[in-house]
Amino acid sequence: MKRILTILAALICLCSCEKLEQSHWLYNMWSGEYDITMTNNDTGEQEPHIAGISLEFSDDRSECIVQGGVKDHYTVTKKTYKAYLNETEKIFVLNEGDYDSRILYWGQITAAGKCTLNFYSGDKLVTVELAAHKLE
């Protein structure tokens, strides 16, 4: 009997912990890939490449680390931005300062565990489908 109660208590604890982990509508880790074109320095020709981007929101979702790079190169950029969330519309924006600063990245939750991220690369608008990795 004691063993059954212990197992039930463990299951209840696990279920409640899982609910606590999923209590925030925005996952804290996202990543995705997108196609880019880069100029070959030797030939001057445009070459297709695949770039990756990841977002890691702080526990309180007030900041976000954006990390990106080209898959077949070793250059990776990593920068922290301020995050502003709109729970009603399930959107977020990232910028370098206060709320009125220029928006550098913006995204919207499209489905459970899916998000569309937008940003400009030069003059070109880039849209990337991101997948979530974990909740906190």
Q: What are the roles of these predicted feature ranges?
A:
Residues 18-20:
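Bacterial signal peptide processing site
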Residues 22-49, 85:
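Tryptophan-anchored aromatic micro-motifs
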Residues 87-108:
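An anionic, turn-rich surface loop/hairpin at beta-sheet edges
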Residues 73-85, 116-136:
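Edge beta-strand at a domain terminus
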Residues 2-7:
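Sec-dependent signal peptide recognition
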Residues 13-16:
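C-terminal motif of bacterial Sec signal peptides marking the signal peptidase cleavage site
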Residues 44-87:
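N-terminal glycine/threonine-rich, aromatic-flanked beta-hairpin/loop signature
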Residues 105-121:
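Low-complexity, intrinsically disordered Gly/Pro/Thr-rich segments
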